Amino acid sequence: KKTITVRTGYFVINATNGDKTIKRSTSLKDSINDQRNPGYCFRILNTSYVIFGLGGNMLTLDGSWKDLGNANMSGWINVEPGGRLYIERFARLINTFNNEKKSGAPIMTYGDTQINCEIGRCKGYNGGAIKNIKGTLKVYGDTKIHDCVSVTEGGAIHNSQKGTLSIEDSEIWNCEALEEGGAIFSKDADSSCVIYSGKIHNNKSGESAGAVFSGYGATLVIGRSTSGPEIFENTSGGSGGGVRCNGGTGSDAGGITTFIRGTITNNTSGKHGGGIACGEAGENGQSKLYMSYMTISNNTCTESGGGIWTPNNIQGTGTEYAIIQNSRITSNTCHKYGGGISVHGKVYVSNCSIEHNFTGDRGAGIHITEGGTLKYDMGTISDNKTLDSITGTGIYVNGQLKINESARIAENNVVYLPKGKYIE
């Protein structure tokens, strides 16, 4: 009926003697549902430390969204700076909509939050399940976030303002952002998102990034040396069916992205980059990319870069050239240029298999635009196809191609050089 405020101390809240539910009141007469200023069910302040669902039976935290209809509602938990919240696997959060001030999420955290539980059927304005601002958010273990919606960005999670987000061994699916980041949205300089492992699938966005958006100066890391996440069957209305990295608009657009290991498969983009679309850097930003040991396959886009799309001012993380190495880029499709990779800036490709990609126009394996430069070293380009079987089944060169003798381009693939273009 009213907000429970934890000002100090350590508390463990479990269900005993059977499953239990803590539910938001459905009466608009109660203070928690004051339509001028609806409250959170829990507020965790200062040095307080609260754990839900550490053991015992299932504890359900219910936000009563379906019962309250179109009423003004706030989220379930607000963790303020210095507060600590852990939700463990014997708890779950459901049926919560935060529409208060058009900026909130069911869980709002500025502190230290760890999630190892189910979150489902929730909705927010920035983050369908969780919004992390300046805090540390760890999502791990048995976490399952599903069927959540953000009216803006981050269908499941929104991370910003120097927020630190890590995801490991978790699953996020059937979430939707009406704008960007069907599952995850991370932005701002000094913010970071690290996805070590897990599954992110069947999410969608109205604009870019069907699964994961990172931009406006943020850092994104996918995978680790021994394993990586599976990002599959996501759909975006704009660029980046799977991942939109170094994204954004305006002077602060860009970021730093490192792909260490993982798979990005069967994603669909309504613009560029069926698997991955890397964004252009703004005048105050940078767009840096390093990729190794990735599988980018069976992705589709309506424009260019069926597998990967790279921008004009792309760089490496410490090198002049963005680096794509030791990876498989296979069976991707685009309607225009670059079935496997669309190169607009300086890109170094080494020891990659670029095979069985298709384009309806030019450069089934790789398309190099005017102003783009590709250094190609080792690896194989084979069995890629264009609609007319002429215009660069292997590589279409409208920019510069620098190729090492150790690289292999199969006889069934063609390097197409328009008049005035050459190979170094």
Task: Please provide the spans of the model-predicted regions.
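Glycine-centered small-residue motifs that form tight turns
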Residues: 39-40, 69-76, 101-107, 125-132, ...
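Extracellular beta-strand/loop-rich repeat segments of large surface/secreted proteins
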Residues: 396, 400-424
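Extracellular beta-strand-rich solenoid/capping regions of secreted or surface-exposed proteins
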Residues: 2-12, 25-55, 62-86, 97-113, ...
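Hydrophobic aliphatic residue packing
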Residues: 44, 79, 107, 130, ...
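Right-handed parallel beta-helix
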Residues: 16-19, 53-63, 84-97, 113-123, ...
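Ordered hydrophobic segments in well-structured contexts
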Residues: 12, 41-43, 51, 76, ...
